[in-house]
Amino acid sequence: MTALMIQGAGSNVGKSMLVAGLCRAARRRGLTVAPFKPQNMSNNAAVTADGGEIGRAQALQALACGLEPVTDMNPILLKPESDVGAQVVVQGKRLTTTRARDYATLKPQLMGAVLESFNRLKATHDLVIVEGAGSPAEVNLRAGDIANMGFARAADVPVVLVGDIDRGGVIAQIVGTQAVLDPADAEMISGFLINKFRGDVTLFDDGYRLIGARTGWRGFGTLPWFPLAHKLPAEDALDIASGPATGGTVIACLTLSRIANFDDLDPLAAEPGVRMVMVQPGQPIPAEARLVILPGSKSTRGDLAFLREQGWDIDLAAHVRRGGHVLGICGGYQMLGRSVADPEGIEGPAGTTPGLGLLDVETVMTPDKRLTRVRVRATHAGSGLAVEGYEIHIGRTEGADRARPFAIVEGQNEGAMSADGRVIGSYLHGLFGADAFRAAFLRGLGIRASGQSHAAGVEAALDALADHLETHLDVTGILALAR
């Protein structure tokens, strides 16, 4: 047993969650197992213990394996900064920023790093479960591919293809994928499974048999929709649980165009007393919101302009006048100040953009990136709690409101607060995962916390996910494919 790979017949078919569930199922069989994704595109990154960064989906998969996340689990991370360009992170460290067209010429040079990371994991674990990206059916991207069949063939890893029946056309998804693949690529596929079924699974029996007959591939089952998916950290901001439709205190988060590292929202959204509202472009900020969160952004100045285009700057000013609370995290913190300057053009064209002016601070973008886990003493609401979090940002922020810090990090003030304490900015991520801090923060908003352990809830959801896979799929057969 060495490795197997999960690929999708399309994007968003549920590969990440399937890999997490298979990792937990394999671990419960007594295997040492590690996740691996050759290439991920996401602005939702996790910081590793050695100061690198990987996709947050791989960090969740590592948790399913009982492991600390390491950079080898996701050697290539692409972090979009615009519609046509992205930052390229290789084995946890920023390599360059490139346009999509230019990345095609860079990809073949990255296969060495991908195989190096994969082989390190393979040498130290019984099983490596690999997740593809997008779909191998995008054959126009096959040249130089390192994410799907290019990797599978280079590493000789068998593939299970996943179709998403929820969006319709699953027969065409899977049979069509075989039809467009190069025969040598198609030979890497050992079987298929159907994901996200709703209703009576037996109603798809004929379709399931038809796929097997048309492709000659073995079927590993049809998986119903996992009802506890909302209890796992969201990979996409659109997947964040919105809480009950009625009841609960509203916390609103602005869905920025380059939203990044929004894992801070999951523990808040899981609180029964909170109704998390993701404010979409074109929508006003709910007047009943007790707290408005400005999340992280991969393009602070760009998202400041985007925010103003939605009229959210006007809504925020009105929210503050009504006595509402505002929390800016990372890029959101930078937006709250008087200005954001990027003299070297690190995130885009050089220049300075006026901020929202809700905090008396100013930010200057610098080339150095702070990427570290930290242990802090939270000063907000006088909690004085010791909490673990992480920082992942460029830029330095200074100003008078930093005299009222959100926390103390390594003996230094971190973050800033307005004189009335209602507007807060901080570079710290991950604090809301700490139950005591989350309770203290919510108490300051007049919200009673549930007292539930967020970490225990995620662990329970991973166990339930593994149980769900064991019930409906031939997990033993899937794991037996590994070679």
UniProtKB/Swiss-Prot annotation:
Q: Which CDD domains match?
A: CobQ_N, GATase1_CobQ
- Listed name of the protein: Cobyric acid synthase
Pathway assigned to this chain's UniProt record? Cofactor biosynthesis; adenosylcobalamin biosynthesis
Q: Which Pfam families match?
A: CbiA, GATase_3
InterPro entries, sorted: Class_I_gatase-like, CobQ/CobB/MinD/ParA_Nub-bd_dom, CobQ_GATase1, CobQ_N, CobQ_synth, GATase_3, P-loop_NTPase
Q: What does this protein do?
A: Catalyzes amidations at positions B, D, E, and G on adenosylcobyrinic A,C-diamide. NH(2) groups are provided by glutamine, and one molecule of ATP is hydrogenolyzed for each amidation.
List GO BP terms, alphabetically.
cobalamin biosynthetic process
- The scientific name of the source species is Rhodobacter capsulatus
State the active site. Answer: 330 (nucleophile), 429
GO molecular function terms attached to this record: ABC-type vitamin B12 transporter activity; catalytic activity
Q: Which residues does the UniProt record annotate as the domain GATase cobBQ-type?
A: 248-437
Which NCBIfam families does this UniProt record tie to the protein?
Answer: cobQ, PRK00784.1
User: What are the alphabetically sorted keywords of the record?
Assistant: Cobalamin biosynthesis, Glutamine amidotransferase
Gene (name only): cobQ
**Family listed:** Belongs to the CobB/CobQ family. CobQ subfamily.
Instruction: Give the superkingdom in one word.
Output: Bacteria
PANTHER family to which the protein is assigned, alphabetical: COBYRIC ACID SYNTHASE (PTHR21343:SF1), DETHIOBIOTIN SYNTHETASE (PTHR21343)
